[in-house]
């Protein structure tokens, strides 16, 4: 059975068509009692160490929705100060977009300037801490450019503070501004003052705008594990343990693996985003990827989940939603 997912995002119903054909399956069936038991035992042990308001929710149905977006900008965290002082633990404050330190300050700046672009609402911005793969964390040099990996561009851009505004305009498909002398039409009058939509016009960006920003191509799959510890302790604990499990089981072969800041659904931790790189569209030259979001991923079921996805099967029990990109 080919799986096409229906969900409600931005108050609209949409159907996600993937570049690959996935089969929807259930893995917690009669033959997988051991896996079910291992997951229950793990959740129970973790919940015993957490206060009541921060326990994992193991009973409620998973929300069947993910953000609607076209691009994902991932700001790479700096190198760890030491093995005991992890950057994502110490410097990912709860509201990371308010962090004034470079390069994290670029997160809030990008979000602000993306509001004034054509497609800015379709761009997600997060921080990531690289664990393994073919990308390296930037140095702690205060003059270092911010390293930003953009999906589905599959490019690592290196952005200086003075380039932030133009880079945001590039990400968002061009700068927009309100028409200053907009005259109310009779149709506007009938709508009422509170319902008039401000008209905007697009300030054209050069078609080769990306050439102005130093970048490297990197076309491979990604595993992103939510580990925003200062936002929610559950993700901090599970993020670290899932990353350790990926390393211990060798699940990172030919993939980039990283911890990612807040992606929602903390009570359903652990949360994963998988970006499966499919290839390049022969007609458009654009990169094609499938974006798959999962929750309730624990060390006991992590390997089984990734094996199923590699076999083009989506486990219902953990699936939140997804879509194709490009």
UniProtKB/Swiss-Prot annotation:
Domain of life: Eukaryota
Family from the record: Belongs to the AIM32 family.
Name of the featured protein: Altered inheritance of mitochondria protein 32
Protein source organism: Zygosaccharomyces rouxii (strain ATCC 2623 / CBS 732 / NBRC 1130 / NCYC 568 / NRRL Y-229)
């Amino acid at each position: 059975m080919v799986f096409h997912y229906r969900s409600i995002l931005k108050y609209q119903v949409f159907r996600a068509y993937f570049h690959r054909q996935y089969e929807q399956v259930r893995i917690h069936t009669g033959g997988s009692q051991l896996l079910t038991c291992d997951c229950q035992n793990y959740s129970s042990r973790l919940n015993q160490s957490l206060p009541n308001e921060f326990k994992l929710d193991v009973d409620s149905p998973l929300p069947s929705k993910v953000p609607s977006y076209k691009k994902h900008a991932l700001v790479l965290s700096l190198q760890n100060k030491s093995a005991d002082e992890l950057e994502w633990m110490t410097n990912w404050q709860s509201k990371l977009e308010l962090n004034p330190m470079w390069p994290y300050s670029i997160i809030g700046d990008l979000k602000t300037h993306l509001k004034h672009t054509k497609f800015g609402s379709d761009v997600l911005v997060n921080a990531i801490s690289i664990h393994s793969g073919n990308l390296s964390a930037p140095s702690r040099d205060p003059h270092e450019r911010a390293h930003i990996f953009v999906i589905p561009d599959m490019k690592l851009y290196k952005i200086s503070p003075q380039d932030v505004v133009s880079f945001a305009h590039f990400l968002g498909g061009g700068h927009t501004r309100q028409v200053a002398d907009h005259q109310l039409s009779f149709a506007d009058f009938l709508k009422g003052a509170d319902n008039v939509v401000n008209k905007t016009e697009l300030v054209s960006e050069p078609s080769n705008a990306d050439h102005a920003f130093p970048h490297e191509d990197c076309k491979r799959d990604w595993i992103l594990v939510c580990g925003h510890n200062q936002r929610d302790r559950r993700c901090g604990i599970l993020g670290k343990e899932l990353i350790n499990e990926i390393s211990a089981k060798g699940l990172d072969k030919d993939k980039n693996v990283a911890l990612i800041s807040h992606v929602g659904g903390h009570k359903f931790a652990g949360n994963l985003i998988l970006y499966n790189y499919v290839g390049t569209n022969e007609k458009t030259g654009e990169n094609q990827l499938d974006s798959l979001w999962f929750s309730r991923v624990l060390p006991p079921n992590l390997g089984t989940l990734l094996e199923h996805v590699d076999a083009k099967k989506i486990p219902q029990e953990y699936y939140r939603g997804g879509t194709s990109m490009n």
